[in-house]
């Protein structure tokens, strides 16, 4: 499994099928980049200059909304993930 370092988080992107109002399914080339995912792994947290570690706000299993162009896409074990900083998460869906 991927284990992120520092304040990084591994997200499994949730892709929704996009349809127009008339029911036409859009091809991948016409879809917007997804912004929702599920947290699958979290790093230990950010370390300040004085050595103090800042705790994480996100936990494994959280559904989150993140910045549109945030993170780095990686493929691991046949699945695609996004590794991003915790500050790129905009909201947690509860």
Curated annotation (Swiss-Prot):
<dbReference type="GO" id="GO:0051087">
    <property type="term" value="F:protein-folding chaperone binding"/>
</dbReference>
<protein>
    <recommendedName>
        <fullName>Co-chaperonin GroES</fullName>
    </recommendedName>
</protein>
<dbReference type="GO" id="GO:0005524">
    <property type="term" value="F:ATP binding"/>
</dbReference>
<dbReference type="Pfam" id="PF00166">
    <property type="entry name" value="Cpn10"/>
</dbReference>
<keyword id="KW-0143">Chaperone</keyword>
<dbReference type="GO" id="GO:0044183">
    <property type="term" value="F:protein folding chaperone"/>
</dbReference>
<comment type="function">
    <text>Together with the chaperonin GroEL, plays an essential role in assisting protein folding. The GroEL-GroES system forms a nano-cage that allows encapsulation of the non-native substrate proteins and provides a physical environment optimized to promote and accelerate protein folding. GroES binds to the apical surface of the GroEL ring, thereby capping the opening of the GroEL channel.</text>
</comment>
<comment type="subunit">
    <text>Heptamer of 7 subunits arranged in a ring. Interacts with the chaperonin GroEL.</text>
</comment>
<dbReference type="InterPro" id="IPR011032">
    <property type="entry name" value="GroES-like_sf"/>
</dbReference>
<dbReference type="InterPro" id="IPR020818">
    <property type="entry name" value="Chaperonin_GroES"/>
</dbReference>
<dbReference type="GO" id="GO:0005737">
    <property type="term" value="C:cytoplasm"/>
</dbReference>
<comment type="similarity">
    <text>Belongs to the GroES chaperonin family.</text>
</comment>
<dbReference type="InterPro" id="IPR018369">
    <property type="entry name" value="Chaprnonin_Cpn10_CS"/>
</dbReference>
<dbReference type="GO" id="GO:0051085">
    <property type="term" value="P:chaperone cofactor-dependent protein refolding"/>
</dbReference>
<dbReference type="GO" id="GO:0051082">
    <property type="term" value="F:unfolded protein binding"/>
</dbReference>
<dbReference type="GO" id="GO:0046872">
    <property type="term" value="F:metal ion binding"/>
</dbReference>
<dbReference type="InterPro" id="IPR037124">
    <property type="entry name" value="Chaperonin_GroES_sf"/>
</dbReference>
<keyword id="KW-0963">Cytoplasm</keyword>
